[in-house]
Every structure is written in C-alpha cells, then in structure tokens.
Amino acid sequence: MANVKLFDQTGKEAGEVVLNDAVFGIEPNESVVFDVIISQRASLRQGTHAVKNRSAVSGGGRKPWRQKGTGRARQGSIRSPQWRGGGIVFGPTPRSYAYKLPRKVRRLALKSVYSEKVAENKFVAVDSLSFTAPKTAEFAKVLAALSIDTKVLVILEEGNEFAALSARNLPNVKVATATTASVLDIVNSDKLLVTQAAISKIEEVLA
C-alpha cells in the first residue's frame, strides 16, 4: 500500500492517506493509455465537415447543349464533377469519429495514469475543499498554500458545487469529479489535487 501525505486546504499536513495498490500502485500500461487517449481525442472531433455532391449543388438541371451535332463532348449537366463549380466526388460528409473501447481497457488506462502520477509525486491529497460560497480568490489561496503553480486537475467528490465553481475560472486549472476524470485530462495535467472523499470513490469504482 502506497502512502501519500494528506494536507488541509491551508497547506498544513493533516496525516497520511493509504492508497489502494490495485488502483494507485500498478505498473502503468503505456500501450493501453495510448489507445484510450486516441479514442478520447477522436470523440472530441466535431466531424461537421461537408461538401456538396452533384445532387446538392444548385443549378445544372438543363442539359447544356444537345447530345449530337455540336462537335463537343456530350454533357448532361454543368454541375457534373468535371465542371468548374460542379459537385465533389466522394467528398467528406458529416460523421462521428467516436468509438468505444472495452470497459476493462478504459479502467486499466485510468489505473495506469493514476499510478504514474503517484509514482512521480504529482498526486496531492487534501482532506477536503469546502467553501461557503463560490470564491475564485479563495481557491487561488488554496493552490498557493499547497505550492501548486502548474497545470492542475482538481478531482472532487460529487456535489461539491462551491469548490467546482471556485476553481473553474482559474487559468491552468481543470475540474472533474471522481467518476468524470478522464485519462486525457490526467495526462494533460502536471499535478492532481484530489480530495479524500474523491480518493475513496476512485478506489470504489476501480478497485
């Protein structure tokens, strides 16, 4: 079992947290992490690209000249693909790039990136993040007290609305819950700031 220091939101040590090795202490599987990141990035693509084929281009309903007798090549429409201003052949159409990986693969990737952050001492555990109202300045003080000045992913327990609202407007800060934190978010952050309740939830889901 790995132990990490537990801090309060004033930056003082409040003990230790014992992490479940089945979640936070495995050998990271880089291949699986790569596959999941590619999948998540594909899901973020809009896929709204579109061009007009010959049936979608306006005009071109009349045959431009008669079939025979002009000496020119026969043509049926000025919107045929070989014409300037004509339709595009096999062009891109709106589509979804999303695809799903097996649940076991996604869970292994999450455990891999969590374990990597713990091994690199980039995992900061805090007993709680409680605010009486959404206050961005107050959350900035918490980060300063914990000496966090890089890109950070804040992982909260469900229902901690004030903390989420306090953090989301800060630069280089992204907020997620224990069940919504993605592999892509974790890899893109320099540090993780995780509440004790969120750690328990992560272990419950992934162990």
From Swiss-Prot:
One of its GO terms (cellular component) is ribonucleoprotein complex. GO terms for molecular function: rRNA binding; structural constituent of ribosome. Residues 49-78 are annotated as: Disordered. Keywords: Ribonucleoprotein, Ribosomal protein, RNA-binding, rRNA-binding. GO terms for biological process: translation. Gene3D superfamilies: 3.40.1370.10. The keyword RNA-binding applies. NCBIfam families: rplD_bact. One of the primary rRNA binding proteins, this protein initially binds near the 5'-end of the 23S rRNA. It is important during the early stages of 50S assembly. It makes multiple contacts with different domains of the 23S rRNA in the assembled 50S subunit and ribosome. HAMAP family: Ribosomal_uL4_B. Part of the 50S ribosomal subunit. Belongs to the universal ribosomal protein uL4 family. This is Large ribosomal subunit protein uL4. It comes from Streptococcus sanguinis (strain SK36). The lineage of its organism: Bacteria, Bacillati, Bacillota, Bacilli, Lactobacillales.
